[in-house]
Amino acid sequence: MNSLLRCCLIKPINIKNTTSFINKLNPKSIIQKSNNYNNINKNILNKFKDSSSNYFINSNKILEICNNNNNNNKYNVNKRNYSSSSNSGNNNNNNYNNKNNNNNNESFYKKFENSFEIKRIKDILFIIVGTFVIFKIYDNKIGIVFCENEIDKETILNDPYDKIPNEIIVELKDSAKDDNIIEESDEDDGIKKISSFKLFFKTIGNDIWLFGFGIITAFFSSWVGLQIPKVFGVLIDCTKNGDSLQGPAIQAIFILLAQAGLNFLYSTMISVACERYSARLRSTLFGAMLEQEIGFFDQNSTGDLINRLSSDVQLVRSALKHSVSLGVKSFGQIVGGVISLILISPKLSLGMMTILPTMVSVGTFYAGWLKSLSVRSQRAQAQSTIVAEEAIGNIRTVQAFSNQHYESERFIEKNQHSLALSTESGVQIGIFQGVTSLALNSVSLLVYWYGGTLVSRGEMTGGQLTSFIIHTMNMQSSFSQLSILFTQIMSAMGGMQRITELINRVPLINSNQGFKLRELKGEIKFINVDFKYPTRPHVHVLNGLNLTLKPGQVVALAGSSGGGKSTIAGLLERFYDISNGDITIDGYSIKQLNAKWLRSRIGIVSQEPSLFATTILENLRYGNPNATEDEIIEAAKLANAHQFISNFPKGYETIVGERGVQLSGGQKQRIAIARAILKNPQIIILDEATSALDSQSELLVQTALDNLMKGRTTLVIAHRLSTVQNADLIGVLSHGKIAEFGNHNELMNHKGLYYKLVQRQLSQQQQ
């Protein structure tokens, strides 16, 4: 069960002359029960009734709650020890009296004075323990907290939830019983750290059976292949002894046919399983990318992320396929070959085995080095991919500035670094394979020399030596395949490490947590908001911002470029979490609300709308996938887009091109407005929606925007101040705060920052 605490000072209280009181008390927030018991959930308080002293948490008890911003804004009990004189009637020595206060302030102080009369240590312990239990049971999320360092020193502003003069009250509001809350979810979206090994089994799913049967079939193929050298040895001995060759020849034919069939089966099963696995892995990785917060994409380039989806997954798929199809068979041939060699000639086998420890040691030494080198090479390759993606994605800009040579040089520079690392990796692989080949050839020479010696002594037959040599050659081939496969596996492990890191990354903003509201009115409040971008942690974009938008109100933001206007729009959609303060919608903190649900209730039209390289119809349906054709046409008409769409030869089936390049700016804007209308949001954000249009297009777009804004809370961000004159209220941003706030006429008469901005733009237009 969750509960929401709201602490509010109902009447503005002048505390200009109470510096000593503030310095003495220095509260971050004081939450105290009113004498009006109807404002308190009595059932909650009765649970913590002290039966021995018959005390309640009431006006004689203080609950001090600290808003800890470093702990996800959850409340913690601040264990301060407030005490007063043992004589409750003696108020002469009370440090909070101020002779200069008027009668109203004296009455205010007496209430605080009486509140701190805690006579016994038992009462203090009762307060601390009781408060801790309350907030443990009710798992408080966030409330409106007055902190001394976050409010005006002279005036504490009221919050109009309950109209009781001069009272500080607590409202314990059980969110689970709130009729406006229709769903609450604490799901973590299954985002848990998982090893690469577990990720494999989770991703391959039911295809693990197909994968397993493929492995078993590969082992059978290896076992069948081990019979071939034995049959060839028998054929040689039969020739020498004059025996019939028909039986061994037929046996050899059946063995070869069986091996071919088994090779087909295991290769097909493993290939199908690996292709399905790579498709699921790519989907899982892409899903993990989409769940990340916007700050993650600010810190990671598009090219690098695309490289993980393509190159890294391809490396893993290829290595997995070859490691099973070739690796399992080669491993089976090596193990079976060793057993067969021992059965044929223990002496010759013992001599050959002396070199195997050297081969294993060399392979182990190179394993870690090749893996780290592979990771570095893949990252360098990703950098060259980034340059290529940027250049091709902005090819019109590149060609407009005739910078093809410059972009080519950038790509060559990044590619050279990737080439150097790839070359180093190739050299190391060559060394490894050369050493492996030397070891295997040494084994072959040993077999030929010592085997011939044993045949001359009569300890082996010619057929046995032939069988032994064929087994040795098969083992040599298997070792060569494993050495090549080993380097592929090391590269794949580097790619898998990058994939697993991203899948395991827990987004800083979980879009699936929080509750949804049955009805969204659209009241928005920014309360003492501080914000810094993750990529610029030392730059304060917003600093103590306070802003209120009432339901259905149109509020415009003006100010110089880079002042934080678009940042406010991003924070409202919770693309980022604020550093300090709070943002509330209909009285609920934005951190409590389900982010996906919230964004589905917000429509945005930006200066450069993002359209997908598909049809106009599909772009419109992005606002509402379930919209009917009639609803789409009606939305297009309201956005003044239906006429120009109908004039296209293919109408709504017209392809708009990548990012809508085949449409004009005004056409893209009107499609974006129609898309927002289909979304039917309660809150609208217009981020410089008409600043890049000509006067004729602006008139059409502005008419469409007027249709969109009807009855909806609207936040308008504009550089051209002529577009915001009709707004209900205008806020002027300066140094991360609202410096001026009012309608157009009020701000012009004030002749402050807004007046200067208007005059500056008028003079620029005249010039």
Swiss-Prot record:
The chain crosses the membrane at residues 208-228, 252-272, 324-344, 350-370, 429-449. It is found in: Membrane. One of its GO terms (biological process) is sorocarp morphogenesis. It is a multi-pass membrane protein. It comes from the Eukaryota. ATP binds at G559, S560, S561, G562, G563, G564, K565, S566. Gene3D superfamilies: ABC transporter type 1, transmembrane domain, P-loop containing nucleotide triphosphate hydrolases. GO terms for molecular function: ABC-type oligopeptide transporter activity; ATP binding; ATP hydrolysis activity; ATPase-coupled transmembrane transporter activity. Residues 524-760 form the ABC transporter domain. Keywords: ATP-binding, Membrane, Nucleotide-binding, Transmembrane, Transmembrane helix, Transport. One of its GO terms (cellular component) is ATP-binding cassette (ABC) transporter complex. Pfam families: ABC_membrane, ABC_tran. The keyword Transport applies. SUPFAM superfamilies: ABC transporter transmembrane region, P-loop containing nucleoside triphosphate hydrolases. Its main location: membrane. Residues 81-104 are annotated as: Disordered. Residues 211-491 form the ABC transmembrane type-1 domain. Belongs to the ABC transporter superfamily. ABCB family. Multidrug resistance exporter (TC 3.A.1.201) subfamily. This is ABC transporter B family member 4. It comes from Dictyostelium discoideum (Social amoeba). The lineage of its organism: Eukaryota, Amoebozoa, Evosea, Eumycetozoa, Dictyostelia. The gene is abcB4.
